[in-house]
Amino acid sequence: MGQKVHPYGFRLGYNKNWQSRWFSKKDYANFIYEDYKIRSYIKKLLYSAGISKMEIERAGGKICLMLSTARPGIVIGRKGVEIEKLRLELRKNFGQEFSLEVTEVRRPEVDAQLVAENIAMQLERRVAFRRAMKRTVSMARKFGAEGIKITCSGRLAGAEIARTEWYRDGRVPLQTLRADIDYGFAEAHTTYGIIGVKVWIYKGEVLDKEVEK
């Protein structure tokens, strides 16, 4: 049975960039683990802000953290109070200096990670999974997605046996390298167990082969 490669790993250096950008020889494993802990900590702390992407750069003992969010106001706060509080919390927890940059996601309806989290939130509120998928697909197509595919896996609608249901509209060419495929994953914690939600959104072709900025 064929398995699907991660759309980002498949396109790294072609039309997708690395989300951790640093170089190390002896501290490589420590940095990888620290990046994972930083991402997990921020995701848990700012889940309501709709964090789409976290990019990490390291230089001169300082960590530069770039956050893409649907609600920058929640992250920054009034007069930058919240972002300064976050910087101090990160320094206290990880023992390093942080600089933070926040960019707004203009169209969250076609951002795969935010779409996946939105579906997971609906499933936790007991919305029927088919209705949640169809509503999300039509919204993404309305906002300019050329194709979208959603899969939900787990004990759907409280069924005894776990299964996978999927819904697709438009084209989603996963094997075409020049295709700009956005991918997101989220988990819905329901009374029956965890339901995994995966989203692929096709946004057109990248013709000039430049790595995304």
Swiss-Prot record:
Q: Under the GO molecular function aspect, what terms does this record hold?
A: mRNA binding; rRNA binding; structural constituent of ribosome
Q: Which PROSITE patterns match?
A: KH_TYPE_2 (PS50823), RIBOSOMAL_S3 (PS00548)
What domain of life does the native source organism fall in?
A: Bacteria
Which Gene3D superfamilies does its entry note?
3.30.300.20, Ribosomal protein S3, C-terminal domain (3.30.1140.32)
A biological-process GO annotation: translation
A single Pfam family, by name? KH_2
What keyword terms does UniProt attach to this protein?
Ribonucleoprotein, Ribosomal protein, RNA-binding, rRNA-binding
A GO cellular-component term linked to this record: cytosolic small ribosomal subunit
Similarity annotation = Belongs to the universal ribosomal protein uS3 family.
Q: What is this protein called?
A: Small ribosomal subunit protein uS3
